[in-house]
Amino acid sequence: MKKVKRSSETENQVFRRPLLYLVTICSRCIITRLQFNNKYTGTAMTESITRDSMQYDVVIVGAGPSGLSAAIKLKQLAEQNGREISICVVEKGSEAGAHSLAGAVIDPIALNELIPNWKEKGAPLTHAVTQDKVLFLTEKKAFNLPVTPNFNNHGNYIVSLGEVVRWLAEQAENMGVEIYPGFAAAEVLYHEDGSVKGIATGNMGVGKDGEPTDSFQPGMELWAQQTLFAEGCRGSLSKQVIERFQLDQNSQPQTYGLGIKEIWEVSSEKHQPGLVVHSAGWPLDSQTYGGAFVYHFDDNKVAVGFVVGLDYQNPYLSPFEEFQRFKTHPEIRKTFEGGRRIAYGARSLIEGGLQSLPKLSFKGGVLIGDAAGFLNMPRIKGIHTAMKSAMLAAEAVFPLLENLEEVENFNSGKEAADYQQRFEQSWLYQELYAARNVRPSFKWGVYLGSIYTGIDQMIFRGKAPWTLKHHGKDNEQLKKAAACKPIDYPKPDGVLIFDRLSSVFLANLAHEENQPDHLVLKNPQTMIDVNYKEYASPETRYCPAGVYEIVEENGSPRLQINAANCVHCKTCDIKDPTQNITWICPEGASGPNYGGM
């Protein structure tokens, strides 16, 4: 096929973008009228709707670092081979970067490969790390620890992940990639042979009772030769394809963490641009994995965050309140006293590493980034690994793409089996291999885990002739409340310690109240019979946004779900002891808008 000029791609993109919105609007007018006339006479909504469809070469679910890197790499490969390919990226956030949350210190190794002239193009990597500190905290004291290779950030940058993602989106759109924010991918579509056909976006304007409102819009079916799942940690559709294709049958159980972050404005006297601080120890006990970070970047701003491994055992533990307590430590509070908190967010992290990675490909699609689990937990970094996984996937997917005009029967999806081999031959595999034994060693507790990590990383250099196993699923680690002691947390003072509601306000949430619940209980009574009676309702503590609340109703306890508070961290989907809670996508553009987070 002859090479297509960039201008042609741009014209095609300009035409297709309004087309998708136009088809959606027209469908709304026609289908809504039919459904209201029929009044849904005993017919489920999904059976009443005839959805419109559009076909692309590639559909990518999620406009994060991995999804956008895959799109850019695919367009680069197409240009190098004189081809034009169509790529659609759907993003559930209100804009690219709206739901992107990380510490974040980025290693530019993958960006150097993807866009070598990123500095000239104005990438928002402007705050180089100038100093690393690693602390071990007791309740009153802080001890400086040696900066091990994992915590050496020379050559790295303190960034806002949201800003990086928005910049990547600009680069992708300039190459002809179509990005549609505000469209939540709600369903995986399959060919008759079981291979992935694409995705369907969610219906919008459905009331809490499941009936259409005046603003009803049906979802769209987006078909593709290859569908790339780049939803991030615990993606709802990624979870489905992993289960359907049994992609994790040869993997160890995945393990997760919950990361909570704030941004503060501090006085110039306390601001140290480029300083990166990591800490372990207090306030967590010796059986709970976790740690904290303090990053000084521009304009007197400091990012402070706290990560708790979701394999913790005590149901009374509250990651949010552990974070608030952390800021009261004498070594930490001196940075923030007199400052002002300006942003808040939370997100789950996928920590299992190499031995927990699922099979990466299946017929019709692949998993990339944190949807698969490429985070390097010992380095507390996942942006560069997500980007590299996406680039490898793009290289494996591109040769499978046929000219759609020449495809007679689009009725089966091919498998990019080469993706796994490319991964195993890359620096990404070597990095994750060297880190593989760190996280599982903490099943022995913080002290033994730390000693083992020192031996593994400093003596064996990550090449020990064995691979440790994780101790099981996170939700299975909780002990019964009767076997644990309640934890007494300090009360909010509005200075260093805050409550959940004032924190969630800073996440800039948007949520249409009149929509079906996106936090689905398989059995509502289980939340009382098991969670409340046996585990003291841990969901009221592990949720960092105050979504779950026990209230009295007619003298009996009842779980109240405040869905509008949800920051889309997915912790409930991971940690609920009976796996009774399923997180699904709410309407597109719902959730936080993290902006400069």
Enumerate the predicted regions with their spans.
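Beta1/beta-strand and adjacent pyrophosphate-binding region of the FAD-binding site
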Residues: 52-66, 88
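Glycine-rich FAD pyrophosphate-binding loop
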Residues: 75-99
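N-terminal FAD cofactor-binding segment of flavoenzymes
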Residues: 92-139
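Short beta-strand to alpha-helix junction loop
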Residues: 151-170, 313-317
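Predominantly flavin-linked oxidoreductase catalytic cores and closely associated redox partners
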Residues: 174-332, 392
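FAD-binding beta-loop-beta segment adjacent to the flavin cofactor pocket
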Residues: 347-373, 377, 504-514, 527-542
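Active-site-proximal substrate-binding core of FAD-dependent oxidoreductases
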Residues: 377-379, 395-443, 592
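Iron-sulfur cluster-binding cysteine motifs and their immediate structural context
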Residues: 533-564, 571-593
